[in-house]
Regions:
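A short acidic, Gly/Pro-enriched loop at the edge of an enzyme's catalytic core
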Residues: 113-121
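A short beta-strand submotif of the Rossmann-like class I SAM-dependent methyltransferase core
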Residues: 123-127
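A short glycine-rich, Lys/Arg-flanked "PGG" loop and its adjoining helix->strand segment in the class I
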Residues: 137-149
Length: 235
């Protein structure tokens, strides 16, 4: 049985410091600093006149801070399950922008987003907690509605492969990365909480779904092993 929302919240409540490191990002995630930089640059390039960013699963605020290096002084709305994460993100983002900062603690599946309220949506290492195809469709459709025309969404996340044999290959290579990072025990620890907590979908599934809910342009910034950075622009 997969972790409940409360289980996930408690784990992140206790892990604020690890998610506050701008240099390493989340070390268990392959190429996290590169993905963070690519997403910030792509968001700025596609939505240069943005005024308001929505960060879903904002964690300690790293992705929002990286975006503010490219597009200074945006208004920011931050959403996270974890109140300690949200408190840290609000503090850090508040110091980095002259714009307004609004914090919302809760589950994105239960939060009603305003129509055309944002210019950029960031969703980093959060959507793999969605459970059913219906939830994925509903959330992607909500993101599309929440963006103003010309707005963009940028995602970095754990993804599956569409071909089972390739999934096994990528998972083996990810395990080798984790062992090199620390040791076999750390690999087994990460694999255990992914199995317990996460329900990722293939990159191709998500790209197709972005198109289906109405995004006009879809592209991939980076794909390595079982992680991908990608995005879409609303017409």
């Amino acid at each position: 049985m997969k972790s409940t929302v409360d289980d996930i919240r408690r784990r992140f409540d206790a892990d604020v410091e690890r998610f506050s490191n701008m240099e390493t990002g989340q070390s268990a995630t392959v190429d996290a600093p590169l993905a963070m930089a690519l997403i910030a640059e792509a968001a700025a390039a596609t939505t240069p006149h943005a005024r308001h960013v929505l960060a879903v699963g904002c964690g300690a605020g790293n992705y929002t801070l990286k975006l503010l290096e490219q597009l200074p002084n945006l208004d920011a709305t931050l959403i996270d399950l974890s109140q300690p994460m949200l408190d840290r993100a609000t503090e850090r983002v508040g110091r980095a922008t002259t714009g307004s900062v609004r914090a919302i603690q809760g589950d994105i599946r239960e939060i009603e987003l305003p129509d055309q309220g944002y210019d950029i949506v960031l969703a980093a290492a959060v959507l793999h907690h969605l459970r059913t195809d219906a939830e994925w469709r509903a959330i992607f459709a909500a993101f599309h509605r929440a963006l103003r025309p010309g707005g963009s969404i940028w995602i970095f996340d754990l993804v599956e492969s569409s071909i089972p044999a390739v999934q096994q290959l990528q998972w083996r290579r990810y395990g080798e990365y984790l062992t090199r990072l620390k040791d076999d025990g750390y690999r087994d620890h990460v694999f255990a909480y992914v199995e317990r907590e996460d329900t990722p979908r293939p990159l191709l599934f998500q790209l197709d779904l972005l198109r289906e809910v109405g995004f006009a342009q879809v592209d991939v910034l980076h794909k390595t092993v079982c992680f991908a950075a990608f995005g879409a622009v609303r017409g």
